[in-house]
């Protein structure tokens, strides 16, 4: 793609590149699935926290699902109204609660009995509580991002809901919240989880529900079938006066590419390594989840060589892609990593005292905008007290 080469020439590498057109199209697809539903769509800021991208999603009618004060600040910088912010997470401290209340956030997903006790002590006005329940449903995804089983740290078991409601019946509980995991590509886990939670909602007369997210994308083959999701899930949601959904990866991952420059090609015996200028410091997903990302070399085609694409860091796990067929690669070539818009920059790090990458947006009119400058080495140490 010529535009990616142009970005690399202007802004260097490693660089994340996002396409506004794709971002808007994917956000609209989400809303189309829920046609006829009283929907509050929210974007999961953990997937990508750049306020420029969040502003685009705000323009598309999205609120924000946030976990931390930092994610809330990102939403505020994007101009997202407080009444469309949902506070999620399993480790809310009293100090954080007081901060979010000062920022006028009023929709809260409560994760535990213990958390609700703190809310009861604070007794804030106007807070709408959604209780995260654990439906004991296997999402059939990577264990690190599966969240719907009793062994996981999230939510309260459905069988404990009666005692929860009895204990906190004086609180302004508006509905239930369920989120069984991430990168789910089959409809069946959603159907199983939602059927349990919808029945529980009816038992308590709840007219609102938060169904979480978890929609999987096509990294290497299968993507969630939205037509099947619409057919099997959405009809039961139309009875609710408000349905909250939190979608991150599905919207932003296909909108982004990671550009890396080949430093050298290392050959030994029958093994080849293409060494690039960013590894698990800029994209940790392959190292952390054994995640697969399609890659291609700008301006080259063919399958002349088979190699691991590896980063420059001091770990054998510092790998972008294993055993890929590539054209004959040379130092200076640019490799593009697909579906890199989610959990890329937000999980980047300074390991080996490397700098975080730049972020660039390609506007709908084709204009290239720098939306986050590349870190410098001095940025890494600016908070050190000597």
Swiss-Prot record:
Listed cofactors: pyridoxal 5'-phosphate
Function comment: Specifically catalyzes the decarboxylation of meso-diaminopimelate (meso-DAP) to L-lysine.
Residues reported to bind pyridoxal 5'-phosphate: 214, 246-249, 343
Name the UniProt record assigns to this protein: Diaminopimelate decarboxylase
Pathway the protein takes part in: Amino-acid biosynthesis; L-lysine biosynthesis via DAP pathway; L-lysine from DL-2,6-diaminopimelate: step 1/1
Keywords: Amino-acid biosynthesis, Decarboxylase, Lyase, Lysine biosynthesis, Pyridoxal phosphate
Annotated binding of substrate, by residue: 249, 285, 289, 315, 343
Protein family: Belongs to the Orn/Lys/Arg decarboxylase class-II family. LysA subfamily.
Active-site residues annotated for this sequence: 314 (proton donor)
Record-linked PROSITE patterns: ODR_DC_2_1
Broad enzyme group: lyase
């Amino acid at each position: 793609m010529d535009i990616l080469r142009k970005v690399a020439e202007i802004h260097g590498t490693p660089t994340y590149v996002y396409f506004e057109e794709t971002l808007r199209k994917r956000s609209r697809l989400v809303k189309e699935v829920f046609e006829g539903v009283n929907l509050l769509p929210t974007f999961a800021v953990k997937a990508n926290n750049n306020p420029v991208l969040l502003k685009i999603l705000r323009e598309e009618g999205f609120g924000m699902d946030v976990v931390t004060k930092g994610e809330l600040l990102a939403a505020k910088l994007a101009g997202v109204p407080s009444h469309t912010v949902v506070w999620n997470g399993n480790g809310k401290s009293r100090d954080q609660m007081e901060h979010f209340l000062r920022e006028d956030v009023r929709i809260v997903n409560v994760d535990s009995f213990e958390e609700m006790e703190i809310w009861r002590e604070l007794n804030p006005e106007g807070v709408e509580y959604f209780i995260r329940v654990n439906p004991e449903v296997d999402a059939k995804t990577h264990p690190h991002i599966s969240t719907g089983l009793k062994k996981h740290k999230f939510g309260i078991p459905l069988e404990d809901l009666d005692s929860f409601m009895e204990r906190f019946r004086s609180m302004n509980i508006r509905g239930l919240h369920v989120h069984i995991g991430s990168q789910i590509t089959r409809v069946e886990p959603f159907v199983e989880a939602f059927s349990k939670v919808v029945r529980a909602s009816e038992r308590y007369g709840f007219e609102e529900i938060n169904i979480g997210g978890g929609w999987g994308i096509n990294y290497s083959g299968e993507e969630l079938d939205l037509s099947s999701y619409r057919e099997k899930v959405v009809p039961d949601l139309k009875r609710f006066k408000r349905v909250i959904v939190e979608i991150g990866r599905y919207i932003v991952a296909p909108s982004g590419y990671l550009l890396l420059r080949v430093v050298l090609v290392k050959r030994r015996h029958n093994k080849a390594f293409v060494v690039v200028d960013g590894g698990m410091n800029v994209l940790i997903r392959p190292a952390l989840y054994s995640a697969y990302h399609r890659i291609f070399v700008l301006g080259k085609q063919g399958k002349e060589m088979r190699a691991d694409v590896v980063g420059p860091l001091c770990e054998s796990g510092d790998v972008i892609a294993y055993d890929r067929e590539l054209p004959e690669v040379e130092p200076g070539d640019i490799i593009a990593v697909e579906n890199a818009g989610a959990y890329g920059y937000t999980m980047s790090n300074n390991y080996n005292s490397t700098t975080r990458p730049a972020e660039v947006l390609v506007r709908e009119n084709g204009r290239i905008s720098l939306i986050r400058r590349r870190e410098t080495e001095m940025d890494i140490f600016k908070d050190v007290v000597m």
